[in-house]
Structures are given as C-alpha cells and as structure tokens.
C-alpha cells in the first residue's frame, strides 16, 4: 500500500510518546481543507489526491468529508461528491478545492471543476447525499474559465450571500437567497472583481522587476467582530499564506502580511481554512508530509491559534503536534464508528450501502488510536462490528501507547464475507479515567477483516 511507507518516521514519534496529530487524515491523501461549523461539530470538506498520480499532475476525482466534535478524533464520512455528479461535464479529472455552507436547512457545496468552472451541489445533510440542482455550471461569463477555481462562500450579517473565487485575481458574485443563482443586474452580468493592488494584497517583483500583487489563489472569506478577513495562498510557487482585512466585504481590502511562511515540508501549493469553534480558533492548511515530499499527494493539517488583541493573526508555524488539547472526552459507552480516528497506520476506509463507512485494508501490525476516551469507573466488555472473508485476526485493546497496558484481545473470526457483519466481543480489564485507546491489529498475511464500529460495556 502506497501510504504504508510514509508512516515510519511518524510511527516512531508515536511510539516515543511524541504525539503526532498532523496530518489529521492518514488513510487518504487530502488537500484544500474547507471547515464548516454546524450543530456542535466541525465538518471538513477536502479534495482527494489519488494514490496514483497520472501525467505528473494533480489527479483528483472526488471530494471527501470528515467531522469532529473535539478537534482530535475525526470521523470519515467518505466520498460525498464526485465529478460524476455533474452529468453535463465531460471532465474525468480536476475535482479541485470546494467549500460548503448551510442555509435554511440546506447544505450547499461549491465545487470547482478544473476547466469547467464553478458548480454547486445541494443536500439535506452536511454529509449528503448531494445532488446537482441546476444541471449546469453556476458561474458563467468569466474572462477565462480555467481560472474559475477555489470558491469561498460567505453570508453577511444582513443575509446577503457572496461567492468569491479565482486565480490569479479575485472575482465575486452576490448569490440570491436560493444559493444556486446570483444577481446578474450588477457588475458584468453579475460578476465583479476586487482591486488587486499591492495595497490590497501586498506585492513582490516578478522576473522582469515589475511589482505585482501577492495574491495567487485559494481565497477564504469570513467575518470576525467588525472586521472582514480574506485569507489566501500567495506569491506563486511555492505558496505561503497571507491575509488582508476590510470593513466591508466588497473592500477596499488592506494587506496585513503572512500567516504561514514557506517551509520545507509544506507542499508547493497551500490552501487555508479558518474557523472559530467552541470559543477557540483554528487554522487549516495542507502539507506533503505524509507522502514524503510528493507535491501531488498532499495532506490536511490544523493548528490552534489566538488572535492578537487588535484582531490581527499571528505568524503560525506548521507542526506535527497540531491540536494537542481535546475539546471534550470521547464517550465509549455508546456506538463509536471505527472510522473515528485520531491517528492510524496502514489503514483505508470504504463505504457501502449496508454499513456506511468502515475501516478496511487491515493488515498485521496496523493500528488506529482514539484520543481522550473516558472510561468513567471502568468497563468489562469490548464489542465490535466486524466482517471477514478469510481467517480473520484479532484486535489488541491497549491503553495509552502501541505497547501500553493490554486491556484485552478481541478475536475476529471468519464471518463468511467481507460485507457480512457480526458482533464479536471480548472481556477487558478495568480501566478508569480518560486515556488514549489503541486498537492494534494482529493476524496472518494479507487483509484480515473489516471494522465498522465498537463500544464498551
């Protein structure tokens, strides 16, 4: 498996107690994070860099979603949209950076199709199923459709919604209340653009000595208190992250400086996402850490941060530690999806109509870890929903580390099919309080079993 070779250094860090939380998804290559806060959870939409890169370029066919209530354990919701959802487009590659928003109980996912413009999907749930409500691209009449990428959506305090996008300049429209059309009576058939001056976005000299705007792509627009923020990828290849502020969402914007500088383990592209969640602030971005430097195989990371008193954003450094403090302990006495993971090695996830998302590609020595599990006064039994079309294997249940205290071993037997699910159980030693919990998988050669959920009793 292509991801397995990337874990050696990170796995050693975990064994030595140097807790790694970044990148926050290890089962797939993910990029262009778009976090959305809804109903006590963060839903993060990402692009998906395929394991196999075709023609030495971004190979991206679909969009994935993850969610978390505590910012350390992330639940994989699988592929929530793909290029195939747009039957009017003939593109088989180019599922680039999306963003989602909720309005009036509906969820709108704005998807750029490289070379086919910005499209939109809608669903009744943040994890879908999404469908195409208009049967065509959303944005028309732009100067160059190849530059119509990286949409960011924002609803202002007065209810007016805006969609911004673009490389190498920022365009925007005023969305109508339905979120799937826009006001064409303003601008050029509805399309407007920001002033791309050095005052607005900073500047640097190009190869001809001409000072040009720093802005490159990946805009992220939001409001905090009375100030509007536009965070973006800047200064070409390799990119760093910068930001500008304004007192009106339509500008004028004022350049404020860097948020994240270039670094050796960052990919040659970057893409920001910024949220406040449960009274804390988080900055999302991507690196090529998981792929050992392959720029077309990126991985999402996140850093906690605090605004300065004047509202400015401090300079942030990418770290392996990421979010070190959980916002809430995990309750193991209710069903926990196996694809809720803080860290893992060697695993993949798949999705079926019978069970939804489950953990797959489980081989001997692979593991997953869940952070801050609250055992309360202790548990006596471990139960798991599993399926195996071979001789199966076992799940070692360990406390605090890969080689931590062994609470018990759940034997997984043959269930007569990889999608034939059974509940299998094991007695465990009593543990009290809050601990990280490791599931270490053991068995023979090849795939051992699939893992859908677990709970304690």
Residue ranges and their predicted role:
Residues 1-21:
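Bacterial Sec-dependent N-terminal signal peptides
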Residues 20-457:
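Carbohydrate-active catalytic/glycan-binding domains of CAZyme proteins
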